[in-house]
Amino acid sequence: MPEKIIELFTDGGCRGNPGIGAWGVWLRLAGQERVLWGFVPETTNNRMELTAALRGLEALKRPSAVRVISDSRYLRDGMTQWLAGWQRRGWRTAGGDAVKNRDIWELLAAVAARHQVQWEWVRGHSGHIENERVDALLNRVMDQYAAGGQAREGEGWL
């Protein structure tokens, strides 16, 4: 029997860059769905994209086969093309600059190593149902916080 694949649809966003930001995860396995979200009062879009993937993978209780589907090429390319070189060069880019968001990249690399992860990119705002849903989720989180909400992170089953 083939192993079931967990799907993590992730997105991060920011109003202003830097500015208020949020991340969201739509997790799906065998017909069950769960959402995770969080808010950060001062951040960047890229940090929220990375945080969404990190929190989604951290939510998995045991090593799993996972598809991480994101509209962030920064996330996908970082994990599939750039990470090994950054590590080899002491967290420097090919141009010699310090890698931005190194703190999250290091955490993400460590948690991803526990799983078999496929990193997939989808075009944002193109009608991809799950990407649109997770984008709407993180925008609701930013709206609620802007309206005086206090929760920084949350989750729920659908």
Swiss-Prot record:
Known catalytic reactions: Endonucleolytic cleavage to 5'-phosphomonoester
Binding positions for Mg(2+) 2 per the UniProt entry: 11, 135
One GO process term, biological-process aspect: DNA replication, removal of RNA primer
A cellular-component GO term for this protein: cytoplasm
One family name in Pfam for this protein: RNase_H
Matches recorded under SUPFAM superfamilies: Ribonuclease H-like
Molecular function via GO: magnesium ion binding; nucleic acid binding; RNA-DNA hybrid ribonuclease activity
Cofactor: Mg(2+)
Subcellular location: Cytoplasm
Cofactor remark: Binds 1 Mg(2+) ion per subunit. May bind a second metal ion at a regulatory site, or after substrate binding.
Signal peptide (residue range): none
EC number(s) per entry: 3.1.26.4
Domain RNase H type-1 residue range list: 2-143
Keyword hit for Cell inner membrane: no
InterPro entries linked to this entry: RNase_H, RNaseH-like_sf, RNaseH_domain, RNaseH_sf, RNaseHI
UniProt record similarity statement: Belongs to the RNase H family.
Name under which the protein is recorded: Ribonuclease H
Source species of the chain: Acidithiobacillus ferrooxidans (strain ATCC 23270 / DSM 14882 / CIP 104768 / NCIMB 8455) (Ferrobacillus ferrooxidans (strain ATCC 23270))
